[in-house]
């Protein structure tokens, strides 16, 4: 080969069948045609091709180059690593696998591998992790080798651990409530008391054919009165001189005893790749007078990538409970002469969520993440009132029970819609983007409902709750740079964040228990502005000086009825609580693990010279 020979032609074997684009190859070799051959430029072009294949996941690609026609032409042959043979071995085989060949074909389909096509290691690992994460297989071990007959082809070997096509998971829960007791005492003592709940949960998971896992969880929270003897003494003292003194102490047993509910559930996971490419979960929730059926369906074919998921959850609940919503009916619970009616409650809840994440480049790398959630909730509650004899006896006991008898049944409908959209990710440094959240709730009683006091002349047939929250974050880079000995450049950033929030909230005000009531809707529109000046210390931490300003615009609806003076809250006082100016210092640390969001420690002083310290981790998903 003469050193000054002119390169006339470059042939790419079967270029149309290759994965690499033709424009990319022309960009590499077009500038070399018509000029003396340069080994350095040719090696650089071949290295660029290998890097392209390696970056895309085709690490087993090979490139061969030959000279023809007196060294004036070059033939480039790209072997992309085609699959020659696929061998699959199974262990802990499933008993219900009808055909080994059909099961193998389904595995190859899920892994997106076929004989005669190149292998992509990145996609292969992603598909294997997906099958393992969704418990479609136990484990997959693979190996890739050059074929003995042709070194440009590949032989694949898989070792697959199968799971049983059916897996049973058992759940159990015990829930104890004293809400009736605390609510009754709260009305009598005229002071707020906390609820007392005890919740025990135990799960038995069948992880495999001979492996079980037991979970036990028992939280106890919000106990105010836990001494039953003290509680009984208080009740006896309160009713010792009342019209209830003729009732025996045994009648208080339903009131003193905690309400207990026991739940046993069973989940059945169906996984059978040889018959279907999807699986679903059925959850049966059963307790006293309650039936709950929940169906969850996930189709793996809908999961296009790791960042795109569609799930559909449908839940139907039928609940039959006693109509003892108010404390008075608890006393009459065990009396046989009173007729006892029940409540039928049907709840249908549908939830569809999907997450779309995309990445594009526009002079700099910008990560665009979208989270959209739409949830609709329809609830219908029907409570049948007591029979006439019961109401007559209740009315003859006490004055406040007379008014309570007017509120023994409610019928209403609630519709709730929530939309959420955001395109910023706090893992990026710095954070920028905007957030939009819209929530709307419509509440309406039925025509025969006595939602408000029967004697009140002001009656509202419907209630609305509407909220819009818009958040925008912008960063401005200031022309200030400095360079340290380790040769990295830091930049000060001025961050401006604004929030627009609008709410329409109905508030039910009352002067005393079961006395003057009125519904007062408020329209609240607030603006929040945050200005933050960030000074970087290094590439993992920074100090921020910030100033927050909040201004609400609180208004009453023109349709608001007359409010009793004893129930009113000073609006000037409410407004003064919101009109505050905050300023302070913040230290933000970016942890070396990308999956963990930045950690912030904030020292804040408001306009009233009151200070506080915040420690928080925030991340939008």
Curated annotation (Swiss-Prot):
Q: Where can this protein be found? A: Plastid, Chloroplast
Tell me the keywords, alphabetical order: Chloroplast, Plastid
Q: What is its main location?
A: plastid
CC terms in the record's Gene Ontology section: chloroplast
Query: What is the recorded name of this protein?
Result: Uncharacterized protein ORF621
């Amino acid at each position: 080969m003469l050193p000054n020979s002119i390169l006339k032609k470059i042939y790419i074997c079967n270029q149309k069948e290759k994965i690499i684009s033709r424009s990319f190859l022309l960009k590499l070799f077009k500038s070399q045609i018509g000029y003396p051959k340069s080994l350095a430029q040719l090696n650089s072009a071949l290295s660029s091709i290998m890097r392209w294949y390696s970056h895309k996941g085709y690490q087993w690609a090979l490139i061969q180059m030959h000279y023809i026609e007196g060294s004036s032409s070059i033939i480039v042959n790209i072997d992309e690593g085609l699959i020659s043979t696929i061998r699959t071995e199974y262990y802990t085989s499933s008993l219900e696998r009808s055909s080994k060949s059909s099961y193998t074909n389904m595995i190859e389909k899920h892994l997106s591998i076929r004989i005669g096509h190149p292998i992509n290691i990145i996609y292969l690992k992603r598909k294997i992790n997906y099958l393992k994460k969704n418990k479609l297989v136990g484990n997959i071990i693979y190996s890739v080798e050059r074929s003995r007959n042709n070194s440009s082809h590949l032989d694949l070997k898989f070792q697959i651990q199968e799971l049983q096509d059916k897996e049973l998971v058992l759940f159990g829960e015990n829930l104890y409530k004293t809400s009736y007791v605390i609510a009754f005492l709260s009305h009598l003592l005229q002071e707020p008391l906390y609820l007392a709940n005890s919740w025990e949960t135990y799960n038995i998971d069948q992880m495999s054919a001979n492996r079980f896992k037991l979970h036990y969880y028992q939280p106890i929270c919000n106990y105010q009165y836990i001494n039953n003897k003290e509680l009984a003494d208080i009740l006896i003292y309160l009713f010792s001189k009342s019209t209830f003194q003729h009732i025996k102490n045994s009648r208080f047993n339903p009131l003193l005893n905690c309400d207990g509910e026991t739940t046993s559930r069973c989940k059945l996971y169906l996984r059978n790749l040889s018959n279907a490419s999807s699986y679903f979960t059925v959850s049966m929730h059963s307790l006293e007078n309650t039936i709950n059926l929940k169906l969850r369906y996930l189709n793996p074919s809908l999961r296009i990538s790791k960042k795109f998921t569609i799930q559909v959850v449908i839940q139907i609940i039928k609940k039959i409970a006693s109509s003892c919503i108010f404390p008075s009916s608890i006393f009459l619970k065990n009396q046989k002469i009173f007729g006892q009616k029940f409540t039928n409650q049907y709840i249908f809840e549908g939830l569809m969520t999907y997450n779309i994440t995309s990445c594009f480049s526009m002079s700099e790398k910008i990560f665009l993440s979208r989270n959209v959630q739409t949830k609709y909730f329809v609830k219908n509650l029907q409570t049948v009132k007591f029979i006439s004899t019961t109401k007559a006896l209740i009315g003859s006991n006490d004055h406040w029970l007379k008014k309570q008898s007017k509120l023994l049944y409610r019928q209403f409908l609630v519709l709730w819609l929530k939309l959420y959209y955001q395109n910023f990710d706090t893992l990026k440094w710095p954070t920028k983007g905007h957030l939009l959240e819209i929530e709307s709730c419509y509440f309406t009683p039925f025509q025969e409902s006595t939602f408000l006091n029967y004697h009140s002349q002001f009656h509202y047939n419907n209630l609305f709750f509407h909220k819009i929250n818009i958040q925008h974050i912008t960063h401005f880079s200031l022309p200030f740079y400095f360079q340290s000995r380790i040769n990295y450049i830091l930049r000060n950033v001025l961050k401006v964040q604004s929030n627009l929030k609008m709410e329409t909230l109905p508030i039910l005000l009352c002067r005393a228990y079961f006395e003057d009531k009125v519904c007062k809707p408020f329209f609240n529109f607030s603006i929040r502005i945050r200005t933050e000046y960030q000074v970087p210390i290094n590439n993992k931490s920074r100090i921020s000086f910030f100033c927050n300003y909040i201004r609400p615009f609180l208004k009453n609806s023109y349709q608001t009825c007359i409010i009793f003076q004893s129930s009113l809250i000073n609006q000037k006082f409410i407004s003064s609580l919101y009109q505050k100016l905050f300023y302070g210092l913040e230290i933000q640390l970016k942890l070396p693990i990308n999956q963990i969001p930045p950690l912030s420690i904030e020292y804040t002083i408001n306009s009233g010279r009151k200070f506080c310290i915040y420690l928080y981790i925030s991340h939008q998903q």
